[in-house]
């Protein structure tokens, strides 16, 4: 496991150098552009990381008092509650250690944070901010479909760690020896810890199947509230850091610092920075794969019923969900849902999460990659069954209302035969002089 981690890191570091040289020659295209975008991603990553990590003292109390006891009644570790909603690289790793009670449960809780937590605190608020409003409903369908396979991804990764007896670090460190054997994590503990997650995903599945419209509205409301809270906490933390205003006026400040201090060397700014400097190599690496393997990727995409844009979206998500969000507008609605469903568990596979794991738990790289990838692929199958029919219905409505242009996405194979015929009928109607000003493609967008 350690050897694989070293190999991956050295490959990424080679692309850091290649990307830097390319940026010197031309920083507006190719690997040079990808190198700089990796570094520039530190900012977007820092916003939610800082907001969540600063809130950890209050989130910890909320989890310990409100959610943890519910998990405990089932027999699951309270640490699982925290990483269900907080990403591992946004404070979930440290929070899980503080609430787990032992290393085995800490590591399992951290794995949940790579999938469920990353989605709740990062992918959702950032997606709502980056995507066109017309794409929010497709994002909701994709997210809710992808959440259903989180227990599968956690089961795959923890099973590999347990069976192989992989050694992990038993403290938050980038330099400590890996001395704790994960063979201590038994299958009984794994299954017990997964019970709350299974209950949550079953509830989501039932809601998505029977009340899709209400679930979409609830999802978007939740994301907006979270995004607002994160930005306010970050703003207040910045004011407090430079002025001490809140400590002076209120007599105390319960939030954690967002910049390293004597108490903790891995605060929000440092973690975002660690991730960004690794992405400076990961992004050029993915660019090379996407460029030089474009033909086989398109062949694979066609065989599974996806457009070339959709196939590129899947690969982009594997590096960083920001890269996927950048492409979403060009991807047909059906493939938007499939890509985002894949991204719930598999996003950051070759980017942020690879970087974080390589820094803090290098022996977990292979089991984590297999778990995330397996769950992501299964999520696409689930989404095709439970969410794509609704997505096609919404696409038809968007076309009729002019939100999506009549010819938009047709060139990339986003429609089935039935939708193709319907769109042709709309186009014929327009050619005959149908008075429908809302069908103007120029009016689509936010």
Task: Tell what function each PLM region has.
Residues 33-41, 68-73, 224, 295-306:
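Short amphipathic alpha-helical coupling elements at transmembrane boundaries
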Residues 74-149, 307-361:
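Alpha-helical membrane segments and immediately flanking helix-loop junctions
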């Amino acid at each position: 496991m350690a050897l694989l981690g070293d190999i991956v890191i050295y490959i990424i570091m080679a692309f850091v150098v290649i990307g830097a040289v390319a940026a010197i020659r031309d920083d507006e295209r190719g690997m040079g552009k990808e190198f700089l975008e990796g570094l520039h991603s530190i900012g977007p990553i820092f916003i939610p990381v800082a907001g969540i990590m600063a809130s950890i003292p209050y989130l910890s109390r909320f989890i310990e008092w409100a959610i943890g006891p519910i998990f405990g009644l089932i027999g699951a570790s309270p640490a699982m509650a925290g990483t269900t909603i907080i990403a591992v690289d946004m404070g979930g790793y440290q929070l899980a250690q503080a609430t787990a009670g032992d290393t085995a449960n800490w590591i399992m809780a951290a794995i949940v944070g790579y999938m469920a937590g990353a989605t709740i605190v990062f992918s959702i608020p950032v997606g709502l901010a980056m995507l066109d409003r017309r794409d929010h409903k497709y994002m909701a369908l994709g997210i809710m479909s992808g959440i259903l396979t989180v227990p599968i991804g956690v089961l795959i990764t923890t099973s590999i760690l347990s069976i192989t007896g992989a050694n992990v670090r038993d403290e938050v460190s980038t330099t400590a020896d890996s001395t704790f054997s994960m063979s201590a994590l038994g299958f009984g503990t794994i299954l017990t810890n997964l019970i709350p997650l299974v209950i949550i995903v079953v509830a989501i599945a039932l809601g998505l199947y029977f009340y899709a419209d209400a679930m979409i509205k609830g999802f978007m409301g939740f994301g907006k509230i979270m995004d607002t809270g994160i930005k306010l906490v970050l703003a207040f933390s910045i004011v407090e850091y430079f002025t001490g205003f809140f400590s002076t006026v209120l007599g105390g400040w319960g939030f954690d610092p967002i910049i390293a201090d004597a108490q903790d060397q891995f605060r929000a700014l440092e973690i975002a920075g660690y991730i960004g400097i690794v992405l400076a190599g990961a992004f050029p690496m993915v660019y090379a794969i996407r460029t030089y393997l474009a033909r086989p990727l398109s062949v694979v995409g066609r065989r599974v019923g996806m457009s070339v844009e959709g196939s590129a979206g899947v690969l982009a998500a594997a590096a960083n969900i920001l890269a996927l969000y950048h492409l979403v507008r060009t991807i047909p609605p059906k493939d938007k849902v499939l890509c985002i469903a894949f991204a719930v568990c598999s996003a950051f596979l070759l980017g942020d999460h690879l970087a974080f794991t390589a820094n803090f738990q290098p022996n977990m790289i292979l089991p984590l990659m297999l778990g995330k990838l397996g769950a992501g692929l299964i999520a696409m199958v689930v989404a095709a069954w439970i969410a794509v029919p609704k997505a096609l219905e919404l696409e038809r409505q968007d076309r009729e209302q002019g939100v999506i242009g009549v010819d938009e996405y047709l060139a990339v194979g986003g429609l089935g035969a039935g939708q193709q015929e319907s769109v042709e009928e709309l186009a014929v109607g327009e050619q005959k002089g149908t008075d429908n000003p809302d069908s103007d493609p120029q009016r689509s967008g936010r």
